Design a protein with these regions (language model features):
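Short, compositionally biased
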Residues: 25-41, 132-147
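Short, small-residue-biased leader/transition segments that mark boundaries at the very start
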Residues: 1-8
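Generic structural signal for buried aliphatic residues
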Residues: 12-14, 119, 156
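Short acidic-glycine loop/turn motifs at beta-strand connectors
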Residues: 20, 158-162
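Loop/turn positions that initiate beta-strands
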Residues: 9-10, 116
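A structural signal for short hydrophobic beta-strand segments in well-ordered beta-sheet cores
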Residues: 31, 155-157
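A conserved acidic, glycine/proline-rich C-terminal tail/linker
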Residues: 101-109, 122-152, 173-174
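Conserved, well-structured core segments that form or line functional sites
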Residues: 19-25, 36-112, 118-130
């Protein structure tokens, strides 16, 4: 945190990038500090559901737009907005590479997925508007309306059988 202290009832996103044998991995997870407000817990839960629903559509022959459509639909159904300023990305021996993975959009559009494609899905879901602002430090991002936001992320590989979640945690199953 830049210039602030954690307080009971805050939520925190920890985003971790690793390089192993020349290959990058990228993941993030939300944490609650103490007992949080029910509306913040719900935001974090729905954001995680957005990620999981997006992972379910990943397979050879699917389109990148399918990812954005399912995220946008689930967020909107729960009265949240999807940040459009940031997106997932291709990943491999280069940390950020093509394709861009939008978290909004139309099913059946965009790049068609093929076996071997590796990328991240990392939806940022807001309680209020989708708009964000970058603070003077040039790094910290906040929502324009000051309401809460949540983000979860995984690195994926498209396989012949569907998808492998390369950053799967012990408490998850896909």
């Amino acid at each position: 945190l830049v210039g602030s202290e954690m307080c009971i009832r805050d939520s925190l996103n920890i985003d971790v990038t690793v390089i192993r044998n020349g290959w990058h991995g990228d993941t993030s997870k939300m944490f609650m500090v103490g007992k949080t407000q029910p509306h913040n817990e719900r935001l974090v839960k729905v954001t995680q559901e957005c990620l999981y629903k997006a992972i379910e559509v990943v397979k050879p022959g699917a389109y990148m737009g399918d990812i954005g459509a399912v995220i946008q639909e689930h967020a909107s159904k729960n009265h949240y907005s999807v940040v459009e300023d940031y997106c997932g990305h291709g990943i491999g021996q280069v940390y950020h590479e093509d394709p861009q993975v939008l978290h909004y959009g139309k099913a059946g559009t965009g790049l068609r997925m093929e076996e071997g494609l590796c990328f991240t899905i990392e939806p940022m879901i807001n309680q209020g508007t989708k708009y964000t602002k970058i603070l003077r430090d040039g790094w910290t991002v906040e929502t324009q309306d000051g309401r809460n936001s949540a983000q979860w992320e995984h690195t994926l590989a498209v396989t012949s059988g569907g998808v492998e979640v390369l950053t799967q945690r012990n408490d998850e199953s896909f």
